[in-house]
């Protein structure tokens, strides 16, 4: 990462942050005016900040350099040729019809064809990062800019594009 910074690129992409050295180099590069994009294995935005802290990233560096954390997941898309209403959802309630996978020739018997992405964005403002870096027990969904992963997944289930099991 340090050798890349010397070439003065506008954007630096770090494939994956796995160790303290890579985390520190990426954070330092962001302080020199470079846009740094990186991947990190974490369950959500809050745990991504905690993971960086666990890797030894200095709190002050995190406060200054994180612009946003985007968390993404892929859900399997229900096959429209064979999806079927979820059994037990025949109640006369004001809830949308939910569907489950069935399986047909179009989807090779899996009940799913393709994938769809769900996302959540955690703004990297200093107050948010400080709360998470200090490991305070703050519900991440209160800090989000938009919907949580769960809300996005439930929305797709309600629209019939994926199953509740996804």
Predicted regions and their residues:
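Short, flexible helix-loop junctions that flank or precede catalytic/ligand sites
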Residues: 1-166
């Amino acid at each position: 990462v340090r050798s890349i910074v010397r070439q003065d690129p506008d954007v630096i992409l770090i494939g994956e942050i796995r160790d303290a050295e890579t985390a520190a180099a990426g954070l330092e590069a962001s302080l020199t005016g470079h846009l740094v994009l990186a991947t990190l294995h974490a369950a959500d935005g809050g745990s991504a900040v905690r993971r960086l802290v666990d890797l030894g990233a200095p709190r002050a560096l995190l406060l200054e350099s994180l612009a946003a954390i985007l968390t993404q997941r892929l859900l399997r898309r229900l096959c429209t040729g064979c999806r079927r209403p979820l059994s037990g959802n025949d109640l006369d309630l004001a809830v949308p019809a939910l569907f489950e996978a069935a399986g047909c020739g179009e989807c090779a018997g899996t009940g799913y064809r393709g994938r769809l992405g769900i996302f959540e964005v955690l703004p990297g403002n200093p107050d948010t990062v400080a709360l998470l870096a200090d490991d305070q027990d703050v519900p991440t969904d209160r800090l989000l800019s938009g919907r949580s992963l769960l809300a996005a997944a439930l929305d797709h289930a309600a629209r019939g594009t994926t199953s509740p099991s996804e």
